[in-house]
UniProtKB/Swiss-Prot annotation:
One term under GO cellular component: plasmodesma
Gene expressing this chain: MCTP6
Listed InterPro entries: C2_dom, C2_domain_sf, C2B_MCTP_PRT_plant, C2C_MCTP_PRT_plant, C2D_MCTP_PRT_plant, MCTP_C, QUIRKY-like
Upper taxonomic lineage: Eukaryota, Viridiplantae, Streptophyta, Embryophyta, Tracheophyta
Phenotype of the disrupted gene, per the record: Enhanced late-flowering phenotype of the ftip1 mutant.
Function: Regulates flowering time under long days. May function as a signaling molecule by regulating the trafficking of other regulators.
Protein name: Multiple C2 domain and transmembrane region protein 6
Compartment(s) of residence: Cell membrane; Cytoplasm; Endosome membrane
Needed co-factor(s): Ca(2+)
Length: 1029
């Protein structure tokens, strides 16, 4: 027989109800018309029960439609009903199906009504399990009342706390009697709506434990965790069917591609001080979004007075740090008896294979075996624990021992050994035991680093005119154009309208430059002699660092005349030209625009919208904290080489990029690294990508393979709430959609300026320069591409490099390329958007056709009220919007959005469409495939052509009403318009509105299935479709 076990652990911070600053709480649990209760804890606002209540379930499938009601009462001594202390409702659909998957969780107590004064939380452990034996039946209500009376009797006789144990022992007799009762008729009670606990409160106390799993989670249950404490908010159930104008649930997609909520043991859930979390201090939340990982740190600082080991009278020392089978080596220093290494080694506590640390000093020998110099043994049981913000541990001198364990006469080594966590400042630069097979030269490719994008600016060049151009052919008037090169960017003006020696262009060209301004702007005036043949008439070199910076809207810098230098002129000729003081000239207005934001991402998921100038940036409004916890079920990316995957993560928000350390040969890596960003605009997106490191041991020209990517919009996150989920890592390949694993993240957005954050929604998305002096649309995509290339080039030159393929994947360089799959996705989005309008039209049609007479009568009444009192129309509309918004609040999304395979049309894309999407530009496919795709595009274009033609026809018919193209139709229309003008003038507006409204809402008995007269008249109007060839 299947059982439901509800373990009541404890409660904390309950509301005092007895008038003396205390309460005597007990817990009553009801499930499927079965009711049980715990013992009473007298005068205790933080009671502990540790009692298990068992209920009959029967079929586990019934859990999905059931609710577990947990209510806390104050046990009163005056034979009156207990006072309400709070309640919790838990949906049966989220109850774990085994004890191993369950964990102790803390639930905030909910109010019974709007004016209830309730606080505190309760710790529960709930799970379903098959248990052999007879059925267990909950006691009837009358027996429960008997138990309560017995408790009250004992409380009145033995109210002092020293006799409390006797009360508990006596109550156990009643509990045994309850367990041995026969099945009795339970009391019927209407099942109320259930709410599911999913999220984590940042202010309340409690740690993380394994949460109840939803139906989506049961397909991929998270690994069991240790029991822990947590604080959760409540989640409303799904919307009822048949509701009008409520949010439509998304289409169900493959459970494999869905989000899975987790509950890792994070320190952020153990906080109980509201002020501590609401202060927004960065240091207060350091490393509270990740699980603590303990490491043994060994800092090898230096050695002194080492003995001579070579015949030449010197030694080449290095240090070997050994712990079990793990061995780390320092670099060897040639001919140095007092070496200084300053290297740190980190050994994971989970993989400690010995209780004795061995540090050996050896002499490097190229020909024979390395010589033994001395060693030190350290017992790990005596290693101190250090956790920041503690000061660094001071290193100590250790005298070296020989192979027999005797102290040597010469040689000492300075070491510092401590046990710490990943929050230690030595963690990023330490040699890790899980990277033991990585050479020292490639060790930097596996470490965590923080990068910053270069500061980008727009360079504006206004080409105005040139004077005194001198072509090579004296009798020819030049056809001049201006070519400008800034870095690897090249632009050119159009040819002037008139060919002359003093041409004018008046064109503005935009470029992207970055700090430090090391580029040179090359402006050349060319004479277009023929197709593909240009002759340089002169050019000028302008250093970008000498260009004035324009901060914001204001006066443009004055244009300047620049001397054009002849391209083929030698130095002597140039000096002679300067003596003559004659040269061709060009008039340019050049400035660096600091008031714009340089777009290096798509505007749909941009992470930064601040202007380039630091002086124009607004203060931050919040803090974004990201905990990169772990991943699971990763695909072996190096399976062809007999290896698994060397994964690392990259996160990008604003101009800050972070890269986690690389974990070798791991399909379920655990990083547990936390990073922080300042937030200036909540309507931004953070991007996290997972990659396979192909340069662990000098991978050459191999590219780091992409495993998957996650994007989260900050505006969809609640403030001061911790989100922990497994995100699917989806990659679209020519063979179809592929899931490469799941990434576990912890996210928290903390608001530091509530007023500024709310005011941000009324401000422009981009700096005001984008609206006052907008950049032409045809230039934006080109400038964005150039900005992406500059960022990728600059980050690839860092050490260790953030490689170009990683940056391009994070920035979605190819997002603008044509994709039939993406086109279908956009069309599906439009149809989903218009579905609401379709539902409204269908609802109105049902009203007009009297499908529901009661609803139609109510609409008649409402219509007459609004016509008689038109001043109520706008208040009614806005009140309706308010009510709908409040109604949908119960069904608001409780999970952050993620990259949806169904919305992207990626789970059922045709293979040929994917092959076309991954095709190069220009195409590299055979001619027959290109012909087939062209024919398909023609077919799609024909359908679009038909729809556009129909829209044009309707518009032209409207124009034909007064154009006299059809004299009879126009005459009828203007006579009709005259009659209606007179009728409306002499008739009150309310009467006209009532007549029109009642006519539209008339009963079907007064309707005809034939088209109406206005529709017939409109369809007979002429259009230009018959004029087309």
């Amino acid at each position: 027989m299947n059982k439901l076990v509800v373990e009541i652990v404890d409660a904390s911070d309950l509301m005092p109800k007895d008038g003396q600053g205390s309460a005597s709480p007990f817990v009553e649990v009801e499930f499927d018309e079965q009711r049980q209760r715990t013992q009473t804890r007298f005068k205790d606002l933080n009671p502990q029960w540790n009692e298990k209540l068992v209920f009959n379930v029967g079929d586990l499938k019934r859990l999905n439609n059931k609710t577990v009601d947990v209510t806390v009462y104050d046990d009163r001594r005056d034979n009156q009903p207990g006072k309400f202390l709070g309640r919790v409702k838990i949906a049966g659909a989220v109850v774990p199906l085994s004890e191993s998957e369950s964990g102790v969780q803390r639930y905030p107590l909910d109010k019974r009504g709007l004016f209830s004064n309730i606080k505190g939380d309760i710790a529960l452990r709930i799970y379903a399990a098959p248990i052999d034996g007879g059925d267990f039946v909950s006691p009837p209500p009358d027996f429960a009342e008997k138990v309560m009376k017995e408790d009250k009797r004992f409380e009145s006789q033995e109210f002092q706390f020293q006799n409390q144990n006797q009360n508990q022992n006596h109550y156990e007799q009643f509990e045994d009697e309850i367990n041995n009762m026969e099945t009795l008729k339970p009391t019927k009670k209407k099942e109320k709506e259930s709410r599911t606990f999913h999220s984590i409160g940042a202010h309340a106390g409690g740690g993380g434990g394994a949460p109840p799993m939803s139906q989506a989670k049961q397909a991929y249950p998270p690994p069991p965790n240790q029991p822990e404490f947590r604080s959760d908010f409540m989640r409303a159930p799904g919307p009822p069917t048949g509701a009008v104008m409520q949010m439509q649930p998304p289409r169900q997609q493959n459970p494999e591609f869905q989000l899975i909520e987790t509950s890792p043991p994070l320190a952020a859930r153990m906080r109980q001080s509201y002020y501590y979390r609401s202060s927004g201090d960065k240091t207060s939340s350091t490393y509270d979004l990740v699980e603590q990982m303990h490491y043994l740190y060994v800092s090898v600082v230096k050695a002194r007075d080492l003995p001579v080991m070579d015949v030449s009278g010197s030694l080449d020392p290095y240090v070997e740090v050994k712990l079990g089978n793990y061995k780390g080596l320092t670099k060897h220093l040639e001919k140095n008896s007092n070496p200084i290494w300053k290297q740190i080694f980190a050994f994971s506590k989970e993989r400690l294979q010995s209780n004795l640390l061995e540090v050996t000093v050896k002499d490097k020998d190229l020909l024979t075996k390395d010589d033994f110099v001395g060693r030190v043994h350290i017992d790990l049981t005596e290693v101190p624990l250090r956790v920041p913000p503690d000061s660094p541990l001071a290193p100590q001198w250790y005298r070296l021992e020989d192979k027999k364990g005797m102290k040597t006469n010469r040689g000492e080594i300075m070491l510092a050994v401590w046990m710490g966590t990943q929050a230690d400042e030595s963690f990023p630069d330490a040699w890790h035991s899980d990277a033991h097979r990585v050479s020292h030269s490639n060790l930097s490719n596996t470490r965590s680093k923080v990068y910053f994008s270069p500061k980008l600016y727009y360079l504006r060049i206004h080409v105005m005119e040139a004077q005194d151009l001198v072509p090579s052919d004296k009798g020819r008037v030049p056809d001049a154009i201006v070519k400008i090169q800034a870095g690897n960017q090249m632009r050119a003006t159009r040819t002037p309208q008139m060919r002359t020696m003093n041409p004018q262009w008046h064109e503005e060209l935009m470029f992207v430059v970055s700090e430090p301004f090391e580029d040179m702007v090359i402006v050349s005036v060319d004479d277009r002699i023929g197709p593909g043949k240009d002759e340089i008439l002169g050019r000028v070199f302008i250093p970008v660092r000498d260009v004035p910076v324009r901060q914001e809207v204001g006066k443009m810098p004055d244009p300047r005349w620049f001397n054009l230098q002849r391209h083929s002129m030698s130095m002597e000729e140039e000096n002679e030209k300067r003596k003559e003081k004659f040269s061709s000239k060009i008039l340019l207005r050049v400035c660096i625009e600091a008031g714009y934001h340089v777009l290096d991402e798509s505007t749909h998921f941009s992470s930064d919208l601040q202007p380039s100038s630091k002086h124009l940036r607004k203060p931050s409004i919040g803090i974004l904290e990201l905990g990169i916890l772990s991943a699971r079920n990763l695909m072996p990316m190096k399976g062809k080489d007999g290896r698994m995957t060397d994964p690392y993560c990259v996160a990008k928000y604003g101009n800050k990029w972070v890269r986690t350390r690389t974990l070798l040969d791991a399909l379920a890596p655990k990083w547990n690294e936390q990073y922080t960003w300042e937030v200036h605009d909540p309507c931004t997106v953070i991007t996290i990508g997972v990659f396979d490191n192909s340069h662990v041991n000098d991978g050459g020209d191999f590219k780091d393979q992409r495993i998957g990517k996650v994007r989260v919009r900050l505006s969809t996150l609640e403030t001061d709430r911790v989100y922990t989920h497994f995100y699917p890592l989806l990659v679209l390949t020519p063979g179809g959609l592929k899931k490469n694993g799941e990434l576990q993240l912890a996210l928290r957005y903390t608001c530091t300026g509530f007023v500024n954050m709310m005011a941000q929604y009324g401000r422009p998305l981009l700096p005001k320069m984008h609206y006052i002096q907008p950049i032409p649309v045809r230039h934006i995509d080109l400038l964005r591409h150039q900005a992406m290339q500059i960022v990728a080039t600059r980050l690839s030159r860092s050490e260790p490099p953030l490689r170009r393929e990683v940056v391009e994947y994070m920035l979605d360089v190819d997002y603008h390329m044509f994709s039939l799959r993406r086109s279908k996705a956009n069309f599906s989005r439009i149809m989903s958007l218009l579905s609401s309008v379709t539902l409204v039209c269908k609802w109105f049609n049902d009203i007009c056709t009297w499908r529901n007479p009661i609803t139609t009568c109510l609409v008649h009444v409402l219509f007459l009220i609004l016509v008689c009192y038109p001043e109520l129309i706008l208040p009614t509309v806005f009140l309706y919007l308010f009510v709908i918004g409040m109604w949908n609040y119960r069904y608001r999304p409780r999970h952050p959005p993620h990259m949806d395979a169904r919305v992207s049309q990626a789970d059922n894309a045709h293979p040929d469409e994917l092959d076309e999407e991954f095709d190069t530009f220009p195409t590299s496919r055979p001619a027959d495939i290109v012909r087939m795709r062209y024919d398909r595009l023609r077919s799609v274009g024909g359908r679009v052509q038909t729809v556009v033609g129909d829209l044009a026809t309707q518009g032209e018919r409207i124009q034909a009403l007064l154009s006299w193209r059809d004299p009879r139709a126009t005459a009828l229309f203007i006579v009709f318009a005259l009659i209606w003008a007179v009728f409306i003038y002499v008739t009150p507006f309310q009467v006209i509105a009532i007549i029109i409204g009642l006519f539209m809402l008339r009963h079907p008995r007064f309707r005809s299935r034939m088209p109406s007269v206005p529709a017939n008249f409109f369809k007979r109007l002429p259009a230009k479709s018959d004029m087309l060839l």
